[in-house]
Swiss-Prot record:
Belongs to the N4BP3 family. The lineage of its organism: Eukaryota, Metazoa, Chordata, Craniata, Vertebrata. It is found in: Cytoplasmic vesicle; Cell projection, Axon; Cell projection, Dendrite. The keyword Endoplasmic reticulum does not apply. The keyword Coiled coil applies. It comes from Xenopus laevis. The gene is n4bp3-a. InterPro entries: N4BP3. This is NEDD4-binding protein 3-A. GO terms for cellular component: axon; cytoplasmic vesicle; dendrite.
Length: 573
């Protein structure tokens, strides 16, 4: 009943703008089945008979929700067992998509009357913490189905809770006057409260409990039913509760056999709640409205804890939407982990690239700074050189007359050098002449020496002859006339010898005198030649120095050093 009231509050036209899957129309479900008596006799009703029929809501401003038959028809929409022909009934369709691992996923799709489908694909499933952005309402799918399962467990566990739920449902169905203003704010508050939670099971439980209490509070100002009718409604729901116990047991057996289908017994018993015009049997008043609400809240809390435990222990095959949601949630979490890892790796790569680029930029900045320093130094040196060139240019402008004087001096020195060269050539000719004379004198000296040697030989012969004659004279003194002749010859020979000696000595003296004169002249010539050479060398060095100075002056002035000067021809000659 709490799930039914939750759907009643969610189907309010004031809250339909929050659901993206359904338009602002009331969804009614037409069920092809027999009479009510056949349902009461516990006959099963085929599951292939559900059809979705979309009809416009009769009154947009009606504060009353859907009937119990429509609510139960909506709650009985569950996933059928997958058959070989892939046939789906009750206006439900499934779309097959390929998952990331290569498999196929089936997603349920609602088809409206105008052939517009509401799919429960990956893009339409709700995100955790953002339930208000989904394409369908949170209470229209998983929460309501599990809430209906919790209703069956509530009916099966005891009769007191069934009585309380029956009394509340009877009061909501019998009271025909329109509800007052606090209904819509309470419903919207309950919807917002159910959507803002993080746990879906706690949201469904708080939603159903809040809707039941809000229904009591909304009807309490305009409640005008007598205490006898309240007791009668409680007794009537006690009678219905017994049948609901059997129906809930049958429903659980059927769901265990067919994996998610509901029994028609619960449909038959709960469809009696639609008949609000039947007069309730007379029962005595048992409890007040506050006690019923308090007891209902306590039982709802207890059964909510039990339902939460059952939901935790239930398998995913009991609810197809839950299975789809869990599969999608698992896939989303895996994809989220992969995306986190991918983006973490990308972030690490980007950070490394940024660090490398930062280091490269720092290195480039350092190189640029060094290059800037080097260029600054070169600029300073070029500025200094330009200043020096300017100074040299100013000096060259002032050294114009000095350059002319130096050119004149150079021309004079070149003339002197040419004269010295002429004198050198004359002296060399004289030297050659003197050398010829020396050679002739040497030949004459050799001839004189030969003559002297001959004369010495003759004198030696004469001396030997003289000695022989003296010896003979001493031995033969008798021969006087002969001796006189010999003495005459001897004297003559002595005189000739003395003459030859004197001539030889005279020749030696003349030769010595000539030799001395030649030597003196030779020394004079050599000394003069040395002086000429030294002066020539000195003039040559001075000429080179002057040429260098002229070249420097020309470079300072801007003239090309290769341009010939007037005095260079003279120097070369």
């Amino acid at each position: 009943m709490a799930a039914a009231q939750t759907f009643n509050s969610n189907c309010d036209p004031g809250n339909f703008h929050k659901l993206q899957s359904f338009p602002s129309e009331s969804v009614t479900y037409t069920c092809k089945m027999g009479s009510v008596s056949s349902l009461i006799d516990k006959q099963d009703f085929p599951h292939d008979g559900f059809n979705l029929d979309f009809k416009p809501f009769p009154e947009p401003n009606c504060k009353r929700g859907l009937h119990q038959k429509e609510l139960l028809s909506y709650l009985n929409i569950t996933k059928k067992e997958v058959k070989s022909n892939k046939k789906f009934h009750s206006g439900l369709g499934f779309r097959r998509e390929h998952s990331v691992e290569g498999g196929e996923n089936d997603y349920p799709v609602f088809y409206h009357k105008d052939h517009r489908g509401t799919e429960f694909s990956k893009s339409s499933l709700p995100e955790r913490g953002h339930l208000d952005k989904s394409r369908f309402g949170p209470s229209a799918l998983r929460s309501n189905v599990k809430a209906f399962m919790s209703i069956q467990s509530l009916y099966q566990s005891g009769n007191k809770l069934s009585k309380s739920n029956g009394s509340l449902n009877t009061m909501s169905c019998v009271s025909s006057p329109p509800c007052r203003g606090p209904l819509q704010p309470s419903n919207s508050h309950s919807n917002n409260q159910s959507e803002s939670g993080n746990d879906e099971e706690d949201d469904s439980l708080s939603d159903s409990r809040q809707n039941s209490i809000n229904s009591l509070n909304s009807y309490s100002p305009g409640f005008s039913v007598a205490r006898g009718q309240i007791s009668a409604s409680l007794g009537h729901i006690n009678h219905i509760g017994g049948s609901l116990d059997q129906a809930s047991r049958g429903t659980r057996d059927t769901m265990a056999g067919e994996k998610g289908t509901l029994s028609c017994r619960s449909m038959a018993t709960l469809s009696r709640l639609q008949c609000s015009g039947e007069p309730p049997p007379p029962y005595e008043y048992s409890q007040s409205v506050e006690d019923v609400a308090r007891q209902l809240e306590e039982r709802l809390h207890e059964k909510g804890m039990e339902a939460r435990q059952l939901r935790r222990n239930a398998s995913d095959n009991d609810d197809p939407f839950t299975k789809v949601f869990e599969d999608k949630r698992r896939l989303w979490m895996e994809e989220l982990d992969e995306l986190k890892q991918m983006y973490m790796s990308k972030l690490q790569q980007i950070s490394q690239q940024a660090l490398r680029s930062q280091r490269a930029l720092q290195l480039q900045l350092y190189k640029v700074q060094q290059e800037k320093k080097r260029l600054q130094e070169e600029l300073n040196s070029l500025r200094g050189e330009s200043e020096e060139l300017r100074q040299k240019q100013s000096q060259s402008d002032n050294s114009g007359p000095k350059l002319e004087d130096s050119k004149w001096e150079i021309s004079q020195k070149a003339g002197e050098i040419s004269l010295l060269k002429q004198q050198l050539r004359d002296s060399q000719a004289e030297i050659n002449q003197k050398l010829g004379e020396v050679v002739s004198l040497k030949s004459q000296l050799r001839e004189a020496k030969v003559l002297v040697k001959e004369k010495e030989k003759e004198s030696a012969e004469l001396s030997t002859r003289l000695q022989a004659l003296e010896n003979a004279k001493s031995q033969a003194p008798v021969d006087l006339p002969r001796d006189n002749s010999d003495t005459i010859d001897l004297e003559r020979l002595r005189a000739e010898l003395m003459l030859e000696r004197r001539q030889n000595e005279a020749q030696m003296l003349t030769f010595e005198t000539e030799r001395k004169v030649w030597k003196e002249e030779k020394d004079k010539v050599l000394r003069y030649q040395k002086e000429i050479q030294s002066s020539y060398r000195e003039m040559y060095h001075r000429n080179q120095v002057l040429e260098r100075q002229v070249l420097e002056l020309r470079q300072g002035v801007g003239q090309s050093p290769s341009s010939p000067a007037i005095w260079m021809d003279t120097v070369e000659t």
